Regions:
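Hard-cation-handling environments
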Residues: 1-80
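Conserved small/polar residues in nucleotide/adenosyl-binding loops
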Residues: 178-183
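Patatin-like phospholipase A catalytic core
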Residues: 82-84
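Thiamine diphosphate
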Residues: 67-71, 94-177
Length: 191
């Protein structure tokens, strides 16, 4: 299905956007994403990560990158914005910082705490570990984002140098789009 970009055309994109969020709602979302699913027994490092998130959410510890990132997704989902995240090892996070998906060490069942927020808001959450084919995955996600302006689409290179494998997509689609009108002419992208 092709998305109609007309409502987004000829807009002034420099207007102020209010990104404040109600602190009480923020704490509720933080509680959801830092709670270990009922009946789950996690590996010790993952249990500690969730305990640390609870401390951050309660103001007992400084917020780190992993908590800030997962809370950004939580607030977007809560406000009805869909989120799609792909890349090799994104469910766990390359440096074990994300753990958007956790596994029960007893039976291997998986749980995604953010999904509870998405379900409550009736919006989409998609988090996929991808194969190690950066060019194909970034190309697909770039195309996906071009048809889904209301959602957040992220491709994460597992390590910075892994983006090298997707350099053709970066050069011929993404950078070209922002450096000239050639992308419009070459690829019929009207952003």
């Amino acid at each position: 299905m092709w998305f109609d970009w007309n409502p987004y055309m000829n807009q002034e994109w420099w207007d102020f956007a209010d990104t404040t969020f109600n602190p009480k709602e923020f704490a509720k979302l933080g509680s959801i994403i830092s709670s270990i699913p009922e009946g789950f027994e996690l590996q010790k490092p993952v249990t500690k990560l969730f305990e640390d998130r609870q401390k951050m959410n309660n103001g007992e510890a400084k917020i780190n990158w992993g908590f800030a990132e997962i809370m950004a997704y939580a607030t977007l989902l809560h406000e009805g914005y869909p989120v799609r995240l792909t890349g090799q090892d994104v469910r766990r996070g390359t440096f074990s910082h994300r753990h958007a998906v956790v596994h029960n060490k007893i039976d291997g069942n998986a749980e995604m705490p953010l999904l509870q927020i998405a379900d409550q808001s009736k919006t989409n959450l998609e988090i996929y570990d991808s194969l190690l084919s950066e060019e194909a995955v970034l190309g697909f996600e770039y195309g996906y984002s071009a048809t889904w302006p209301s959602g957040l689409v992220i491709w994460e290179a597992q390590f910075g140098d892994f983006a090298n494998g997707a350099q053709v997509v970066i050069d011929q689609f993404i950078c070209l789009l922002y450096t000239s009108d050639a992308a419009d002419e070459s690829w019929s992208v009207y952003l």
